[in-house]
Amino acid sequence: MSKINEIIEAVKGLTVLELAELVKAFEEEFGVSAAAPVAMAAMPVAAAAAAPAEEQTEFDVILKAAGDKKVNVIKVVREITGLGLKEAKDLVDGAPKPVKEKVSKEEAESIKKKLEESGATVEVK
């Protein structure tokens, strides 16, 4: 039997705990890490998988159209943004335009609900 076959036979007879100790001994003896090559190979896959998993935290509320009740929409836009009458009217007339940007999901949904109740068409991005 060759030396390699003897080593393989010896490794086959080891328990999991003994194998873990063997790996640790190899790492210390030769100054290498058994985990590094595996982690480096897996990292691009993990990074690609993690990107879509990130949840969006900031949302923009976009007024798509004012609808039939433009006056009501202007009132709600003024209430939400704190704009003056002319600025709110210009925003509504210039639709599609952002009403609020970089707000939380809850706030975006609340604004969307208010605007839709007033007759507007709204999108949250």
Swiss-Prot record:
<dbReference type="GO" id="GO:0022625">
    <property type="term" value="C:cytosolic large ribosomal subunit"/>
</dbReference>
<comment type="similarity">
    <text>Belongs to the bacterial ribosomal protein bL12 family.</text>
</comment>
<dbReference type="InterPro" id="IPR036235">
    <property type="entry name" value="Ribosomal_bL12_oligo_N_sf"/>
</dbReference>
<dbReference type="InterPro" id="IPR000206">
    <property type="entry name" value="Ribosomal_bL12"/>
</dbReference>
<keyword id="KW-0687">Ribonucleoprotein</keyword>
<dbReference type="GO" id="GO:0003729">
    <property type="term" value="F:mRNA binding"/>
</dbReference>
<dbReference type="InterPro" id="IPR008932">
    <property type="entry name" value="Ribosomal_bL12_oligo"/>
</dbReference>
<comment type="subunit">
    <text>Homodimer. Part of the ribosomal stalk of the 50S ribosomal subunit. Forms a multimeric L10(L12)X complex, where L10 forms an elongated spine to which 2 to 4 L12 dimers bind in a sequential fashion. Binds GTP-bound translation factors.</text>
</comment>
<dbReference type="InterPro" id="IPR014719">
    <property type="entry name" value="Ribosomal_bL12_C/ClpS-like"/>
</dbReference>
<dbReference type="GO" id="GO:0006412">
    <property type="term" value="P:translation"/>
</dbReference>
<comment type="function">
    <text>Forms part of the ribosomal stalk which helps the ribosome interact with GTP-bound translation factors. Is thus essential for accurate translation.</text>
</comment>
<dbReference type="Pfam" id="PF16320">
    <property type="entry name" value="Ribosomal_L12_N"/>
</dbReference>
<dbReference type="InterPro" id="IPR013823">
    <property type="entry name" value="Ribosomal_bL12_C"/>
</dbReference>
<dbReference type="Pfam" id="PF00542">
    <property type="entry name" value="Ribosomal_L12"/>
</dbReference>
<protein>
    <recommendedName>
        <fullName>Large ribosomal subunit protein bL12</fullName>
    </recommendedName>
</protein>
<dbReference type="GO" id="GO:0003735">
    <property type="term" value="F:structural constituent of ribosome"/>
</dbReference>
<keyword id="KW-0689">Ribosomal protein</keyword>
